[in-house]
Amino acid sequence: MNPEYDYLFKLLLIGDSGVGKSCLLLRFADDSYLDSYISTIGVDFKIRTVEQDGKTIKLQIWDTAGQERFRTITSSYYRGAHGIIVTYDVTDLESFNNVKQWLNEIDRYASENVNKLLVGNKNDLTSQKVVSTETAKAFADELGIPFLETSAKNATNVEEAFMAMTAAIKTRMASQPAGGAKPPTVQIRGQPVNQQSGCCSS
């Protein structure tokens, strides 16, 4: 056991490009916000250590690029993830409709019992909101996953989202048998992931 922390959890932020994943990560990890944020190329991650129920938990949070062309890169990052935050933009109906597609990605690549959280970001833009809280909540309830609306800009529910996810993972880990520290997460269907992708040579 590492003396610096009791748990190390790997979290993923996924969702369409432009929904504010990087802004959520910046707000939670650094408590900062940038109005103009460069689109994430590939994958970026930040670390924040939190205290919960007397335990020190190190969170390694990966910000995956939302663009279709990066799918092959990010698929390998699903494996080993303890929790996945699926993000959409409350002012962009298409990003909400694409949540189903992202959940399919999770089913395909992530471990079976991974924790999920649906997050509707940019909730500060009330006049531009097109995805109602009721619609999103009903959708999340149907799937049996927790749901929160956030604003990275004014920090609404950002801390709550990450801490709720952390608590859910910790509860799940505690309920696993002692020998279950390495659950059978690597069920690779399809080709091996170590193919060289020429993402930088285009």
From Swiss-Prot:
GTP binds at residues 15-23, 33-40, 63-67, 121-124, 151-153. Keywords: ER-Golgi transport, Golgi apparatus, GTP-binding, Lipoprotein, Membrane, Nucleotide-binding, Prenylation, Protein transport, Transport. Pfam families: Ras. One of its GO terms (biological process) is pollen tube growth. The keyword DNA-binding does not apply. It comes from the Eukaryota. Residues 174-202 are annotated as: Disordered. The keyword Membrane applies. One of its GO terms (molecular function) is GTP binding. Residues 192-202 have a biased composition (Polar residues). InterPro entries: P-loop_NTPase, Rab, Small_GTP-bd, Small_GTPase. It is found in: Golgi apparatus, trans-Golgi network membrane; Golgi apparatus membrane. PANTHER family: RAS-RELATED PROTEIN RAB. Protein transport. Regulator of membrane traffic from the Golgi apparatus towards the endoplasmic reticulum (ER). NCBIfam families: small_GTP. This is Ras-related protein RABD2b. It comes from Arabidopsis thaliana (Mouse-ear cress). The gene is RABD2B.
